[in-house]
């Protein structure tokens, strides 16, 4: 069943909605429902920012959440886009399948696609990138209320020694898995199943998976 209505006027635009008009010519060689099945690969456009860009996705989500310009760390995010994401060809291609995904989860997925992380810095919504960090200061005894304590966790059999990254291939649009292994341990005993959103390239999925595997071995 369907409900129909006659519109008194024809709209010329639909704000915040992308529309498409198709003219399809069918014949008796098509199945009954084939003329109604249309696949579309759409490119996400951002106002004032490059399409598919990680920074553009950041700003789009933050603005949609109600963040003002003075609450966003534009300098840091733009620097990451200019120095890392754009030169390395890193983009974010993902759409939410339901309304149950929180804004924080989406921001974290955007950052993961750029080998980074979302954070709040000095009250601003910002992003960081994993890697070697410059020291930012020293801790002196005058600033401590008790003795400085450090902790170290050694490798154990409970740690992952392999990572399988599942992503959606941009050519087949099917889920595929890349295996991330160390050359000295091609048959790991404990493998992590990691789902990567927003990445459609197998090389990028492999690099992100290997970074994750390196953290399990060397980041203590």
Predicted regions, residues:
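C-terminal extracytoplasmic interaction modules
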Residues: 47-220
């Amino acid at each position: 069943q369907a409900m129909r209505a006659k519109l008194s006027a024809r709209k010329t635009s639909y704000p915040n909605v992308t529309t498409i008009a198709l003219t399809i010519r069918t014949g008796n060689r098509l199945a009954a429902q084939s003329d109604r099945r249309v696949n579309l690969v759409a490119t996400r456009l951002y106002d004032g920012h490059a399409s598919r860009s990680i920074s553009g996705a950041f700003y789009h989500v933050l603005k949609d959440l109600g963040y003002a310009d003075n609450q966003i760390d534009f300098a840091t995010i733009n620097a990451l886009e200019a120095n890392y994401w754009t030169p390395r060809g890193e983009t974010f291609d993902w759409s939410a399948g339901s309304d149950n995904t929180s804004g924080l989860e989406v921001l974290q997925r955007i950052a993961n696609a750029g080998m980074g992380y979302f954070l709040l810095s000095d009250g601003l919504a910002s992003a960081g990138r994993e890697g070697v960090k410059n020291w930012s200061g020293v801790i002196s005894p005058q600033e401590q209320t008790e003795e400085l304590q450090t902790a170290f966790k050694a490798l154990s059999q409970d740690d992952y020694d392999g990572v399988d990254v599942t992503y959606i291939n941009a050519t087949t649009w099917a889920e595929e898995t890349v295996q991330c292994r160390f050359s000295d341990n091609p048959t790991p005993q404990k493998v992590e199943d990691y789902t990567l959103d927003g990445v459609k390239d197998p090389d990028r999925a492999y690099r992100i998976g290997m970074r994750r595997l390196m953290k399990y071995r060397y980041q203590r």
